[in-house]
Amino acid sequence: MNILIANDDGVFAPGIQALADALKPLGRVVVVAPESERSGFSSALTLDRPLRPIQIAEDVWAVNGTPADCVYLSMNGLFDFEFDLVVSGINSGANLGDDVLYSGTVGAAFEGRLMKQPAIAVSLAGPDVRSYDHKDDYAQAAKWVHDFIAKGLPALPPRHIFNINIPDVPQLKGTQITYQGRRAQSKPITSHVDPRGRQVYWIGLAGEAVTDPQRIASQIQSDFFAVANSFVSVTPIQMDATNYAVLEDLQASLG
């Protein structure tokens, strides 16, 4: 099996190094990732300048572009062979609820949505993960991803991917299939004056998780709930954002 690994934390991030090491027993692993951090780029592609992939080690490439650029290049001519699976991560920080709209980790996985197997976006969730600087800090999460793939990935409809969040806890309680939760409104922007006397702004922190009432008949909970309770969250998400439930009513209202 040929496995493509990308991320949004950059090619030298410890999370992607741990993931590559863990997946090598499953086949050929090729890392193609941004040359520096590109968090928050979602599915953005670079269309206004050339991209420059540079091989920095055997089967490791750095690209002066976005996470989605890395996967797009890899699937469309950078290599003379095809990939069977795209795995994006391991991200330093959670990608839960509304965060998937902004996530470069998820965006890279969505570029692999038409592969032979469902693409995977994987993130390590916890308050301390952004300070981790060694691949051993991601070892438990990387092993979980290895085992998840080795067992055989569950089938998904076309153009769907797995968004996986692994809590950073000493002992995982298990795995839960989850739905995408949501956040309250983001915190307000903050204003500062830089050393040159110019007004600058920081985008506010993400809003707190919202506890939705149970939306489906089974006991399936949100991704926030699973991670908060030390379970790995596995959420199937799709590229098609159409709300089919309201199509006919909307059509009637315009008729």
From Swiss-Prot:
Main localization of the protein described in the UniProt heading: cytoplasm
EC number(s) on file: 3.1.3.5
MF terms (GO), sorted A to Z: 3'-nucleotidase activity; 5'-nucleotidase activity; exopolyphosphatase activity; metal ion binding; nucleotide binding
Gene Ontology CC terms, in alphabetical order: cytoplasm
Places the protein is found: Cytoplasm
Annotated catalysed reactions: a ribonucleoside 5'-phosphate + H2O = a ribonucleoside + phosphate
Keyword set includes Metal-binding: yes
Cited PANTHER family: 5'-NUCLEOTIDASE SURE (PTHR30457), 5'_3'-NUCLEOTIDASE SURE (PTHR30457:SF12)
Name the record gives this protein: 5'-nucleotidase SurE
Organism: Acinetobacter baumannii (strain ATCC 17978 / DSM 105126 / CIP 53.77 / LMG 1025 / NCDC KC755 / 5377)
